[in-house]
Swiss-Prot record:
Organism lineage string: Eukaryota, Viridiplantae, Streptophyta, Embryophyta, Tracheophyta
Compartments, as annotated in UniProt: Plastid, Chloroplast
Pfam families, sorted: Intron_maturas2 (PF01348), MatK_N (PF01824)
GO biological process: mRNA processing; RNA splicing; tRNA processing
Family statement drawn from the similarity comment of this UniProt entry: Belongs to the intron maturase 2 family. MatK subfamily.
Role this protein plays: Usually encoded in the trnK tRNA gene intron. Probably assists in splicing its own and other chloroplast group II introns.
Record's keyword terms, sorted: Chloroplast, mRNA processing, Plastid, RNA-binding, tRNA processing
Protein name per its UniProtKB record: Maturase K
Organism the protein comes from: Lilium canadense (Canada lily)
Length: 512
């Protein structure tokens, strides 16, 4: 990141308004293809057979010129159909490589205004640098502290824009370079037309994987716009004076005001925003899923859902189904978020109160934030990865049988340690032990398949040596902190939650 900021200091005052010339700078493509600077966790390199992937700025200039020709898309598709089974160097893949190069370089360029704004904002506010602030596990201590005091929660699936032009219009507020916006439109429509025109499923898959960094940047810009306006409206509604409850008695008057909720005018905030006035509301989002929790009533959450549906319809010009927002009470509802099932438990207690010679019992309840590992989705992810059946029965992975014994054990152990590291925040570890058992037995059967033996004979020969590969660092540390607790049993019951603040992305098996 420091190297990235060093390049951004060049002509810093001109970059926001003149981004297009940066496409012809070689260091832009160096940044785009540097794995250490690639912030996308979905980055997957694509290899081209028969092409040496050499880079030339002269060919990039020619490609940009040719891309604006009307027959470029038709020629590209026809050439791919002619050379699909050719044994020589494929001209289509060479052009695809340069198109991929330009699009990835363009991804770096459009991020420059946002990177500069983020750096300048952190410098003005003097925000201390901390890796813990970037951990996705930092969300769970926040939920643990807040959800137990709230009443209702709304589980939101953020809809995707149905038209690319909406994404371009969002960026127009931050990027004033017109040629860059035109090039962005061309990229988006090219991808859309190729997916509709090319009939090969393999080619569609390659193009869908071509530049996830650009598409995730556009999607995050869209979500950022939604959240910016949400925070703005919420702040404005909090400044309004209280509305008399008498207005709720007349239903026609109530719905009359609800119809004007999407009209935003500085002089009319009191009319438009009072139905969603809620000073105590919490919003958490990860990727395309968000949580809106409040201490208010169920009716208030319905108003927020009404507001969201109308907001997406009138501001982003697409319809979002109301069922994408599930409203439930926190006391009897479990919702899935970031690989966990979250819920609020009520533990009743009887407290004995002694006053002089009289004593009496006081019934009270304590709300507790509970986190559970969803075993069924995890087993489904393991079955898709060919570690077990859909019922959770461990099976061998023959595709790994060609590796050495050390590589096989290391692969299984790394998957197991990563899952344990991510799910150590669970209050109950039985599901985690079952996942470990599946991976351990799948590893044994893979080794047995390689050596033409049985899993039972292999486990008897290896003993506990294979089991040690599946122990996590957290368990070894806890063995010193809690020496009286048996941590390595499959049927243990441990309730110590450990949130790891070094996790910056969700595990692929968890996210399926």
């Amino acid at each position: 990141m420091e190297e990235f900021q060093g390049y951004l200091k060049k002509d810093r005052s001109l970059q926001q308004h003149f981004l297009y010339p940066l496409l012809l700078q070689e260091y832009i493509y160096t940044l785009a293809h540097d794995d250490s600077l690639n912030g996308s966790i979905f980055y997957e390199p694509i290899e081209f057979i028969g092409y040496d992937n050499k880079f030339s700025l002269v060919l990039v200039k020619r490609l940009i010129t040719r891309m604006y020709q009307q027959n470029f898309l038709i020629y590209l598709v026809n050439d791919s159909n002619q050379n699909r089974f050719g044994g020589h160097t494929n001209y289509f893949y060479s052009h695809f490589f340069y198109s991929k190069m330009v699009s990835k370089g363009f991804s770096v360029i459009v991020e420059i205004p946002f990177s500069l704004r983020l750096v300048s904002s952190s410098e003005e506010k003097e925000i201390p640098k901390s890796q813990n602030l970037g951990s996705i596990h930092s969300i769970f201590p926040f939920l643990e502290d807040k959800l137990s005091h709230l009443n209702n929660v709304s589980d939101i699936l953020i809809p995707h824009p149905i038209h690319f032009e909406i994404l371009v219009q969002i960026l127009q507020c931050w990027i004033q370079d017109v040629p860059s916006l035109h090039l962005l439109r061309f990229f988006l429509h090219k991808y859309q037309n190729l997916n509709k025109t090319i009939q090969s499923n393999k080619t569609i898959y390659v193009f869908s994987k071509e530049n996830k960094r650009l598409f995730w940047f556009l999607y995050n810009s869209y979500v950022s716009e939604c959240e910016f306006l949400l925070v703005f409206f919420h702040k404005q509604s909090c400044y309004l004076r209280s509305t008399s409850s008498g207005a709720f008695l007349e239903r026609s008057h109530f719905y009359g005001k609800m119809e004007h909720i999407i009209i935003v005018c500085c002089n009319n905030f009191q009319k438009t925003l009072w139905p969603v006035k809620d000073p105590l509301i919490h919003y958490v989002r990860y990727q395309g899923k968000a949580i809106l929790a409040s201490r208010g009533t169920h009716l208030l959450m319905k108003k927020w859902r009404y507001y969201f549906v109308n907001f997406w319809q009138y501001y982003f010009h697409f319809w979002s189904q109301p069922y994408r927002m599930h409203i439930n009470s926190l006391l009897n509802y479990s919702f899935y978020f970031m690989g966990y099932l979250l819920r609020v438990l009520i533990n009743p207690y009887a407290v004995k109160n002694q006053m002089l010679e009289n004593s009496f019992l006081i019934d009270t309840v304590i709300k507790k934030f509970d986190t559970i590992i969803p075993i069924i989705p995890l087993i489904g992810s393991l079955s898709k990865a060919k570690f077990c059946t859909f019922s959770g029965h461990p099976i061998s992975k023959p595709i790994w049988a060609d590796f050495s014994d050390f590589d096989i054990i290391d692969r299984f152990g790394r998957i197991c340690r990563n899952l344990s590291h991510y799910h150590n925040g669970s209050s109950k570890k039985q599901s985690l032990y079952r996942i470990k058992y599946i991976l351990r037995l799948s590893c044994a059967r893979t080794l047995a398949c390689k050596h033409k033996s049985t899993a039972r004979a292999l486990l008897q020969r290896l003993g506990s040596g294979l089991l040690e590969e599946f122990f996590t660092e957290e368990e070894q540390v806890l063995s010193f902190i809690f020496p009286k607790t048996t941590l390595f049993t499959l049927h243990g019951s441990h309730r110590e939650r450990i949130w790891s603040l070094d996790i910056i992305r969700i595990n692929d098996l968890v996210n399926n």
